[in-house]
Design a protein with these regions (language model features):
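N-terminal-proximal low-complexity accessory segments that begin disordered
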Residues: 1-25, 29-42, 50
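Catalytic alpha/beta active-site cores
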Residues: 33, 37-274
Length: 274
């Protein structure tokens, strides 16, 4: 109540001042002095930190893109939530990052090789190795609670900063399936698959590099869409429930084929200490 009264008082003072000075040439300094006089502008206080507890790090700590989508559109909502992770290989291949766009819808082997070179150069900056580069690696193994990068069968190295290793996934034969790195609280997933079309042609069998992308999403009910009547609200809450339970899906026609979109599965990894 006190804050509302203060707000009303300041608004009335602003209205009266603007009426009184209507048509006059007013300097920025005059305006600033008046705003300070009525308490609209106050002196900067000491540095402080927000102390709200139990807030997910994606909201409180991690700096990254945030998407806004209408909750009433299940397909858009799923796209936004799934955009937490995005393929760097796909992003570089399908855009003009390399200087030009793809010339056709068919896979271009030479362009693909340039994409791999570009991405490994990115890894050299994101998670540099000791005394070598990512394009020299022929194998990545988990040995004695460490991630070892092999240059040859008898020569190996590690990351310059091994604290960048968030964790990994193993195949049933104990070879690495996925290596998860991080920098500035954002993660990078290096996928390894010797049977993948890209992976089998790569020295280290790296099939893709996935970057943490849209860290969070606003599922919007009132700006990009207006859920005001009962029918719209039922759709909104049904989609929200589907996201919370993990069973939301959307079917649509693409290239004359029915496509179904669902939530990506959670990612489970092992840390170096198990």
């Amino acid at each position: 109540k006190l804050l509302l009264d203060k707000r009303h008082k300041i608004q009335s003072q602003l209205d009266n001042w603007n009426k009184k000075n209507k048509g006059k040439e007013i300097s920025i300094q005059d305006q600033k002095e008046y705003l300070q006089e009525i308490g609209y502008i106050v002196k900067e206080g000491e540095d402080f930190k927000i102390k709200t507890t139990n807030v997910d790090p994606e909201i409180a700590l991690v700096c990254g893109p945030q998407l806004v989508v209408p909750i009433t559109n299940a397909r858009y909502a799923l796209n936004a939530v799934n955009a937490r992770w995005g393929s760097l290989y796909d992003a570089v291949y399908g855009t003009d990052v390399l200087g030009s766009l793809p010339e056709s819808n068919q896979y271009d082997q030479k362009r693909g090789e340039k994409v791999v070179d570009f991405v490994k150069s990115h890894l050299d900056v994101f998670a540099p190795l000791k005394d070598t580069n990512w394009d020299q690696i022929v194998d990545i193994r988990y040995e004695n609670n460490k991630i070892i990068f092999y240059i040859t069968q008898n020569s190996s190295t590690t990351l310059q900063n091994e604290n960048q290793i968030a964790g990994f996934q193993l195949n049933t034969n104990k070879t690495i399936k996925e290596l998860v790195l991080f920098k500035n609280n954002l993660h990078c997933r290096v996928l390894i698959d010797p049977n993948h079309p890209i992976g089998k042609g790569d020295l280290a069998n790296i099939s893709d590099v996935i970057l943490e992308s849209a860290v969070s999403s606003i599922l919007d009910c009132e700006d990009s869409v207006a859920t005001v009547d009962a029918e719209d609200k039922v759709i909104a809450y049904r989609n929200w429930l589907g996201l919370m339970t993990g069973n939301l899906e959307a079917k649509f026609i693409k290239n004359k084929q029915t496509t179904k979109r669902v939530l990506n599965k959670d990612i489970e990894i092992l840390t170096l200490n198990g």
